[in-house]
Amino acid sequence: MGEKRTIIKALKNSAASHFIKKLTADTSLSSIQEAINVVQQYNATDPVRLKLFHTPRMVSQGAHFAFCLPTKKPHYKPLLLSQNALDEFNLVQDQDLEKILSGEKVYYSDSIFPYSTVYSGFQFGSFAAQLGDGRVVNLFDLKDKCSGQWQTFQLKGAGMTPFSRFADGKAVLRSSIREFIMSEALHSIGIPSTRAMQLTLLPGTKAQRRNQEPCAVVCRFAPSWIRLGNFNLFRWRHDLKGLIQLSDYCIEELFAGGTQFEGKPDFNIFKRDFFPDTETKIDEQVEKDETEVSTMTGDNISTLSKYDEFFRHVVSLNANTVAHWQAYGFANGVLNTDNTSIMGLTIDYGPFAFLDKFEPSFTPNHDDTAKRYSFANQPSIIWWNLQQFAKDLACLLGPEARDLELLLKGELNSVDDALEKTMIERVQKLVELSANEYKYVFTTRYAQIMSQRLGVDLDLEKCMSSTNLKDIEHAAEKAKEFCDVIVEPLLDILQATKVDYNNFFIHLQNYKGPFFIKDKSDTATLFGAFDEEYLGMFFNSKQLQQMAETEEAFAAGEKVFDANGELRLLNEKLQEIRNWTQDYLTLVPPTETAARASLAKKANPLFVPRSWVLEEVVDDLMYSQRDGLQDPSSELDTSALKKLYLMSVNPYDRTKWDVTLRPELETKWADLSHQDDAKFMMQASCSS
């Protein structure tokens, strides 16, 4: 376990700040000592200090970050602390911890000083030049006790930085609650994500959005906050030195000097497209001249440089995360390149949502009228972002070993037409191989998660991690067959019948009865062949009643009128359900109910924070307790918020939801049978 420690002790004995140690500061303040001198010589309202730490500017060529500080606020009131996160660092809760994690107190030393990073980004497909941490201040790095991995702590909503542009540096309470809860929820489900440590209300601080709103600060942490947008910046700047610095930092510091790239299959295996008919639309996003074929031709890539391996690894990490999103029905809402993590983490929570119903075209982003970032488009959009990343790295991916060595030494003074052609062809080949590997990683991981959710043991994990061609072929074949025969037909049914997406899997895992109760020849309609409880997973009560009445009418020899064709559609779905159930039972026989449930329970969260639940909790604070939010001495009722946190971070274990705390909310939020359908599939704006 390790001995519990105070935050001050942890910072003095074991903290670091790797980003500022290895990378380049803006020349306005080029060292930690210069930044410390500003703090010691000028008070918080002095124009010199305000200009250096809190005034937007274009930073110097080659800069990766700028030193800055959290803006001092009149009042701070911690609302929620993630005990799970606290335990991962063996930290005790005390006043110093609360103050440092809110920005009220700032820790710095000769090797640590707060900073904000600079990056660019493709936003809704269009390039935006210098962006950066406009309201985020990075604090320090600490190792977590489980993996021994360094985690970078930062404050979101910490005030103006050199990268705030035209914004105010604030984060409203509404979006802060949403990010805190959802980031911890995704992590607890098993979806790669950044984390949250503390949520702090800022009484007396408001932000003008559509209306004036109360503000908050979220302390969050991750192994790295570097995004693809950090690399977009250096392509735009034509800054090779800065690009190499950033790439080397990622390889050495984030991926253990490249040792994490080991154990992958021969890259040339992915000259073959193992999923040529995939519906993830990746093929449409591969920018090349030739028509896509199932197997690439041409010479193999003989050796991979560390930059090739780096690109390949980032592709795989992101493919894995998107597979989790699609399997669990998580819609990100905004997937710009500056919202795409170099480590494949779910990052920068905005207008996100879990699907209430399976609707692939749904976007939780009210402002995404073209549905660029719809649920169905997420795999292809992430691949599009990765292609921009390939362009950022092109000058490092294109050269063969000898030319790359000259480039890194600064001795590749010119590139003739022949070398340029060779370099372009090599980058194109790497991108094509990566496209096929992206589809392979995405589809096999997606099939593996979906099979678990359905209680089916496909035994894919071993093959997925193998470097053997036969194992890779086997994994691809099993994944494709499972998706074609089981997953896609099921999703078609769920999309048509519009039952709750997540709870369908819960109901199926808990079902112990017979799937069929009669042969179809013994019933008036197909409806009578099914167990009604089983059908209740696929249809709502109104649809079930319609089908039951039709069954009775046919049995009595009465005519049934179907004026709007609804009964015909229901009967078509019944036929599809029968076919699907028969296929499903070949994988999980009815006699294996216990084994099916045991496997599924490990992959099916009993609760996911829906948009309407988050809105209820936000409204409880923002409207029911409006006056108290601005009074630092008021006692706020945070019981609903704490209940939501407990349910979100313990998605597989109802016993940890604390039955003594607002027990009525468990039924209200987790059992949706009595909920108003109008609450579902809510959208949010980008305003935060």
Curated annotation (Swiss-Prot):
Induction field: Induced in absence of non-fermentable carbon sources including glycerol, lactate, and acetate (at protein level). Expression is regulated by zinc levels.
Superkingdom, taxonomy of origin: Eukaryota
Keyword Transit peptide attributed: yes
GO cellular component: mitochondrion
Result for mutant: D348A: Loss of catalytic activity. Loss of ATP binding. Reduced survival and growth in response to reactive oxygen species
Transit peptide: 1-23
This protein's UniProt keywords: ATP-binding, Disulfide bond, Magnesium, Metal-binding, Mitochondrion, Nucleotide-binding, Nucleotidyltransferase, Transferase, Transit peptide
Cofactor: Mg(2+)
Recorded phenotype for the gene knockout or disruption: Reduced growth and survival in presence of oxygen reactive species.
Amino-acid positions noted as binding Mg(2+) in the UniProt annotation, renumbered to this chain: N339, D348
Biological process, per Gene Ontology: cell redox homeostasis; protein adenylylation
Entry EC no(s): 2.7.7.-
PTM note: Forms probably one or more intrachain disulfide bridges.
InterPro entries linked: SelO
Task performed by this protein: Catalyzes the transfer of adenosine 5'-monophosphate (AMP) to Tyr residues of target mitochondrial proteins (AMPylation). Involved in redox homeostasis by regulating the cellular response to oxidative stress. Regulates protein S-glutathionylation levels possibly by AMPylation of deglutathionylation enzymes such as glutaredoxins.
Miscellaneous comment text of the record: Present with 2430 molecules/cell in log phase SD medium.
Protein family (similarity comment): Belongs to the SELO family.
Protein name: Protein adenylyltransferase SelO, mitochondrial
Species the sequence originates in: Saccharomyces cerevisiae (strain ATCC 204508 / S288c)
Gene encoding the protein: FMP40
